């Protein structure tokens, strides 16, 4: 294994082990046998010191209104960068839904300085990847490159961001690809279920405008539409740049000043995303001949900025484990029942299951919600869930791209990037009473959608008085 790569792997492994040791310490209390350290057994760092150490790796600055977050990871062989665009679904409407996704996808095909063939040749030679993605709250133009080829990759990346070609041929190619992808959504039960769920959960909300668009809205868009939309979005007040890798912050500032920092500042001010409100339980059934019923139910959840997000994460993890135990392990009603918590500005959590016996499966899942609401969980259960959560979380943060995405998410919709690294103490502070409180507050008025056999669904089971 390359020595630098080995150091990077050992670094992330040490972070995980440190957090798990700290979790074990907090779970067990400060017993005398642990507290009395020997000279050869130094005390484990506190959560506060870990947070401070991680925060010190991040440098933030502004260039002409463009906020930049630079996280240095010494020894890393790769660099990840993302130019994030604020707004998401709030930027579009029912008539132009999908324009931002199409604009970013078409931009990566060619730019003024790097026509299609030249761009593909250079990116292939360096192993560099330029891509894009979008969600309800923001979109991103992304870069993944080796440290060796970062400077040249940055030139291409910024040319794509600033001077995309939007040729008729490129736009038509990407347009067709996106339309074909959307056209078969109803053929995939899981994808179709999510589409049905969005229509029910997001009625009257900006999220109803899908950033993916529809075949109809995408087909109406022309290159001139993309150029006008690009000009509108490329203002530093709308953008956030995040870079993670073994780079010098002053050098990064110089690169930004000579490229993205020359964009107009603009006057964009992000609007507060309205929170969702479900006033009652409901079930919407779409008939489809399938081997099993596909079922999902959503309830409102706290956003990342709310103190309730910490006990809600623990409650959702407990619910997931209990649902799996009751539905899959004990009764084998479904292969992969699930409880989940998303990370949106207007947030939701929910239940998911595929089952022939829809009523029994949902009844069991709702019973587990009632159990969380009425029976205090043990402190041991909470600490076990937190330890499991931390393991999964930090393993998921091994790559520079994942860390860049996490910093951006918290900066854009989570109250600031520092909240992405100081949640340990807040998770550890969750109490059994907190679990009961958030379960009662949020896990109610569930909006169910069912794709399958209507005759197998007792709507009374789905709309039972959970949490009421």
Which functions belong to the PLM regions below?
Residues 177-196, 274-293, 329-333, 344, ...:
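Short acidic/His-enriched helical or mixed secondary-structure segments at domain edges of catalytic enzymes
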Residues 7, 20, 37-40, 45, ...:
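Acidic/histidine-enriched segments that form metal/cofactor-coordinating
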Residues 36-50, 240-245, 352, 383-468:
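C-terminal regions of mature proteins
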Residues 16-29:
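Bacterial N-terminal signal peptides
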Residues 37-46, 203-207, 211, 236, ...:
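An aromatic/glycine/proline-enriched structural segment found at the starts
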Residues 1-12:
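N-terminal secretory signal peptides that target proteins for export/translocation
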Residues 109-113, 144-175, 341-396, 463-468:
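M16/insulysin-pitrilysin zinc metalloprotease superfamily fold
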Residues 82-147, 210, 318-333, 340:
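M16/MPP (pitrilysin/insulinase) zinc-metallopeptidase core fold and M16-derived inactive scaffolds
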């Amino acid at each position: 294994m390359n020595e630098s790569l080995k150091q990077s792997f050992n670094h992330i492994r040490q972070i995980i082990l440190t957090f798990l040791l700290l979790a074990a310490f907090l779970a067990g209390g400060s017993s005398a046998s642990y507290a009395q350290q020997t000279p050869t057994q130094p005390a484990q760092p506190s959560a506060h010191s870990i947070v401070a150490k991680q925060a010190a790796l991040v440098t933030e600055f502004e260039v002409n209104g463009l906020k930049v977050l630079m996280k240095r990871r010494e020894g890393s062989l790769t660099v990840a960068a993302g130019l994030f665009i604020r707004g998401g679904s709030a930027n579009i409407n029912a008539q132009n839904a999908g324009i931002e996704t199409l604009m970013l996808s078409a931009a990566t095909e060619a730019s003024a300085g790097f026509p299609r063939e030249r761009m593909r040749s250079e990116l292939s030679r360096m192993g560099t990847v330029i891509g894009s993605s979008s969600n309800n709250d923001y979109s991103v133009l992304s870069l993944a490159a080796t440290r060796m080829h970062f400077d040249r990759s940055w030139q291409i990346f910024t040319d794509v961001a600033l001077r995309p070609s939007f040729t008729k041929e490129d736009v038509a190619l990407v347009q067709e690809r996106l339309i074909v992808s959307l056209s078969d959504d109803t053929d995939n039960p899981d994808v179709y279920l999510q589409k049905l769920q969005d229509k029910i959960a997001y009625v009257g909300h900006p999220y109803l405008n899908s950033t993916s668009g529809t075949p109809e809205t995408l087909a109406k868009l022309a290159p001139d539409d993309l150029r006008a939309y690009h000009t509108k979005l490329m203002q530093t007040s709308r953008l956030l740049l995040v870079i993670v890798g073994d780079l010098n912050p002053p050098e990064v500032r110089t690169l930004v000043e000579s490229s993205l920092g020359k964009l107009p500042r603009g006057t964009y001010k992000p609007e507060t995303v309205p929170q969702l409100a479900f006033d009652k339980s409901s079930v919407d059934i779409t008939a489809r001949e399938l081997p099993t019923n596909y079922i999902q139910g959503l309830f409102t959840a706290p956003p990342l900025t709310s103190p309730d997000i910490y006990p809600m994460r623990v409650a959702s993890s407990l619910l997931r484990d209990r649902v799996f135990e009751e539905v899959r392990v004990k009764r084998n009603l479904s292969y992969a029942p699930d409880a989940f918590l998303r990370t949106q500005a207007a947030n939701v959590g929910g239940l998911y299951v595929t089952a022939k016996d829809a009523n029994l499966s949902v009844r069991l899942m709702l019973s587990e919600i009632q159990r969380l609401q009425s029976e205090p969980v043990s402190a041991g259960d909470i600490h076990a869930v937190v330890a499991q959560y931390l393991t999964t979380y930090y393993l998921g943060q091994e790559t520079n791209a994942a860390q860049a995405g996490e910093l951006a998410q918290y900066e854009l919709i989570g109250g600031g990037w520092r909240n992405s690294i100081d949640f340990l103490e807040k998770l550890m502070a969750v109490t059994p009473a907190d679990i009961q409180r958030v379960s009662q507050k949020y896990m109610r008025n569930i909006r169910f959608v069912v794709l399958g056999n209507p005759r197998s669904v007792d709507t009374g089971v789905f709309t039972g008085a959970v949490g009421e």
